[in-house]
Structure formats: C-alpha cells, structure tokens
C-alpha cells in the first residue's frame, strides 16, 4: 500500500501546473512550450512509475483507492481508484497528450491560453478514467467541454465558430442525460445519496427504471463515442480543429464514451445492457458500412479520416454488445489501437496542410516524390488503420469479429447477417484509405514548381510518428502486452451476464 495519494497527484498536477503559465511573459513562446512539454513528460513518467511499481496486473480489485469527503450535503466524494481497464486508458492518455503537446510546437498565437487548455484537458481525461464516484465522473466529463470549445473556436479553421458551437450543443446536450442518469441512480433508495460506483454495482433496480437510466447514459456516450446518428459533430470538429487538438479528440476523447459504456452501463446496469446489446451490435455493424461509404465521398482529408474514426468505433460497439470475453477484449483493444492510429493520421494530415496549405484531396497529388518521408509514414499508418496483419488494428478487429461469431446470446441467422455486414465494412476500409493515398501522393495535380519547394518531414515530426508506430506494431505482434491488463476486469464484468 502506497502512502502517497498518487492518483490525486496525477489528476491535479497538469491543471495546477497550467495555472502557473500566466506568470510567464506572453512573448516567451519557447519558454511556455518547453514548460508545458516538461509537465506532460513528468506526468507521463509518474503514470509509468505508478503502473510499474504500484499496479498489480491480473488483479480485478480496485487499486490505489483514495476517498476524500468533498460535499457532505450530497455525499459527494473525491473518490479515485484504478483497475486494468482504466490503467490502459490512462497510459494511452499520457502518451498521446505528451505527443500532442510536441505536435503543437508551431502554435505561436495566444500560447499561454493554448497550453493551459491542453493541460486542463489532460487533468480532466486522467480524472475521468480514475473516477470511482459517479458525480466526479460527470464533473470530469464536463471539464473537457470548455477547453475543447476554446481550442476549436480560437485556433480552428475558417468555419471554427460553427464547428465549436455544434460541438458544444451536441456534447452539452448529451451531458444533461448523463447528469440526470447519475442523479437518478445515486438518489434511488431510502438510504440517502450514494454515488460510489463500487457500491452502486451491488444495487438492483426495477427493470423499467434500469432501462430508463441506461437510455440516458447511452445518449451521452453515443455523442462522445460517437454512435450514429449522434456523430455529425465529429467531422465538422475534426475538419476545423488544429491537428494537435484532433490528436486529443481522436486519441482520447472518443474513448471516454466507450469507457463509460463499459464502466457504467455494463457494470452497473447489466439487465438493461443485455436488452440493448443486440441493438448495439446492429447499429455498430451498420455504422461501419455507413461511415465507410460517407468517408469515400469526402473531399476534405481530415473529414475523411474523421469518418474513418466513426467507422472504427462501430467495432467497439459490436464488441461491447457481443457479451463475450474475446469480443469485449477486442473492443477495448480497438479503442487503444484507434487512439494511436487516429492520432497519427490527424497529425500527418496537419503536417501535410502546413506544407501544401490545402486539405482538399482533389487539389493534392504528386507530392510523394518531394516528401517521401511523409508519404512513407502516411502509408504505414493508413495500412495500420485498415487493420493490416502485424498491427494492432488487425488483432482488435479479428477479436471483435470472432466475439460475435462465437457468442451464445444470438441466433445463427443474426450472427451471419452481422458478420456479412462487418465483412463489407472491412472491404470498404482499404478502398477509402488507399484512394486517399492515391489522391494525395500520386499523379501531377500540384504544379511542379510547388512540388519542388515542399519541405519533407523534419526530426520532430518523424519522432512523433515513430513514437506512435512502435506501440502499434508491438501490440500487433504481441497483443498480450496489453490484453493482460484488463482481462480480469472483463471476466468480472461478464460474470454478471
């Protein structure tokens, strides 16, 4: 047992360090950048230390628990704890946020506010994955909204205000349902308010009430994940946001929805989840194909990648709805895998825009010769996104695929139909990704004079790309590297079904 409140330290360190940024001179962009990057590295090293020295793999019980009374009147506690599921996502958060901070190096406008918002997001993301109080979970969920809104509305593209407004309306609207669900589940019963997630997991509810609560939570998570038809904010947001913000959105923010589905809906409301599971599988399968077809018709590079994210989240839904060990493990692995590949693709799309000053695929072409390093990295991560064997996406999608096939909860006809739809989506994925590569890097659309003046990726960009690539290959070759983290938690959750 550790004597230090490690989880509180890693939750509060980024935002507390961010509060010191206004003390730096506004002209000292380089100082602010190095300071923020240093805080992110220290935070990630602390997370790694906690994982290596204080976390016990294959232990399904809650670890490093902390419980501090916060608001007596409503029994609101600062209650933190981690297990394998949350530890994996906390590691992903630390890794991607550190690289996103390095990716934001070219930002020179309002750097103090920009880097403070990055650190505030960092705290909110870590806090959400470590929360063991459902009101604290909601608080951390909401902590993300304002930083992203400001990052989008100030440093976004030409339609940034429209995209930022759409984002805040969708996510704030979904958050209302999350708050109502949290209050309903916490105030149910005659023993006073109870918001401790571990205690709530032992409660039972009337099936009608459980379905109502589940529906409210599902709407909130459907916006974040996102699930069709609550996905339309995502392409607009990605299309206008700075690519470092896109890395955080694709790498971490979408995973908050999947985490909520598993941690809250599956664990606290198993009877309702069993009822909703077939619908999640059906919507997930349709979403894979629908988003793939829409992605194929996108002229904007970042919007095409955004719709590919929507498609990949369909596999997460199928895995969660399969109610099998291999399927749920595959869904979690898909979240980790997409967190890496999605962040990498948006980063490379942003670096491409920095050089060509366009995101429209029909205005690109012929830049492979002048930028071979960018071409090579873009090709590798596109192959990773389409689940090339030997990379993490292949293992994740294969596990989800097998999870629905071996599931004993569905009829043979249902499984055949879902499998066929999944297969169609798997076929469509390389079509829109490889056509994206063809339109960007082959042909002669960019004038030769411009093509010759384009500067290839530098050391910073290559370093970020390699950092994202190594875990993708490592997990693809040896998936037990991460599957062992949360397998015991998956077995515990599925024991209720």
From Swiss-Prot:
* Domain of life of the organism encoding this protein: Eukaryota
Query: How does the entry describe its membrane topology?
Result: Multi-pass membrane protein
Where are the bilayer-spanning segments? 4-24, 35-55, 87-107, 113-133, 134-154, 167-187, 207-227, 242-262, 274-294, 313-333, 386-406, 416-436, 462-482
Task: Provide the protein's localization.
Answer: Plastid, Chloroplast thylakoid membrane
Cleavable signal peptide: none
Chief site of localization: plastid
Q: Which GO terms describe its cellular component?
A: chloroplast thylakoid membrane
Chain coiled-coil ranges? none
Annotated GO molecular function terms are: NADH dehydrogenase (ubiquinone) activity; ubiquinone binding
This enzyme's EC code(s): 7.1.1.-
Per its record, the protein catalyses:
a plastoquinone + NADH + (n+1) H(+)(in) = a plastoquinol + NAD(+) + n H(+)(out); a plastoquinone + NADPH + (n+1) H(+)(in) = a plastoquinol + NADP(+) + n H(+)(out)
- An individual GO BP term: ATP synthesis coupled electron transport
Q: What keyword terms does UniProt attach to this protein? A: Chloroplast, Membrane, NAD, NADP, Plastid, Plastoquinone, Quinone, Thylakoid, Translocase, Transmembrane, Transmembrane helix
- Family per UniProt? Belongs to the complex I subunit 4 family.
Q: Supply the NCBIfam families for this chain.
A: NDH_I_M, PRK12561.1
Its protein name is: NAD(P)H-quinone oxidoreductase chain 4, chloroplastic
> What is the native source organism of this protein?
Angiopteris evecta
Q: Which gene encodes it?
A: ndhD
